[in-house]
């Protein structure tokens, strides 16, 4: 399994620590051809995992737009509002992910390269 640190420095740690509670956040991105599932634990470690039975959040949409989202080129809110991306999961988990994406611009890039 590939692992990347969400928290690059102490400064980010101060902002993200309240978001990273004791439970692991499982997020699945399902495109037309393939799916990517990542977990983010309470230490801020993010790693690719095999798709679980259930994720906290599952995103369905166009593969290209999902990649743009993960690279930080387009906002999650924009894709959801335009209807390009469908979301299944809790509102709390969605808000948590949106906050993490906002505070760590494009942090998924590190895990996609591996």
UniProtKB/Swiss-Prot annotation:
Protein name as it appears in the record: SCP2 domain-containing protein YusD
Signal peptide stretch: none
Domain of life per record: Bacteria
Ranges where the SCP2 domain occurs: 21-101
InterPro entries tied to this protein: SCP2_sterol-bd_dom, SCP2_sterol-bd_dom_sf
Origin species: Bacillus subtilis (strain 168)
């Amino acid at each position: 399994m590939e692992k990347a640190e969400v928290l690059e420095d102490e400064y980010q740690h101060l902002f993200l620590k309240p978001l990273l509670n004791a439970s692991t956040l499982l997020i699945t991105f399902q495109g037309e051809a393939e799916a990517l599932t990542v977990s983010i634990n309470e230490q801020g470690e993010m790693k690719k995992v095999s798709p679980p039975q259930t994720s906290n959040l599952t995103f369905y949409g166009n593969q290209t737009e999902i990649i743009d989202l993960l690279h930080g080129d387009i906002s999650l809110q924009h894709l959801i509002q335009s209807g390009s991306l469908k979301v299944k999961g809790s509102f709390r988990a969605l808000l948590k992910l949106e906050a993490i994406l906002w505070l760590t611009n494009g942090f998924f890039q590190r895990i996609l390269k591996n």
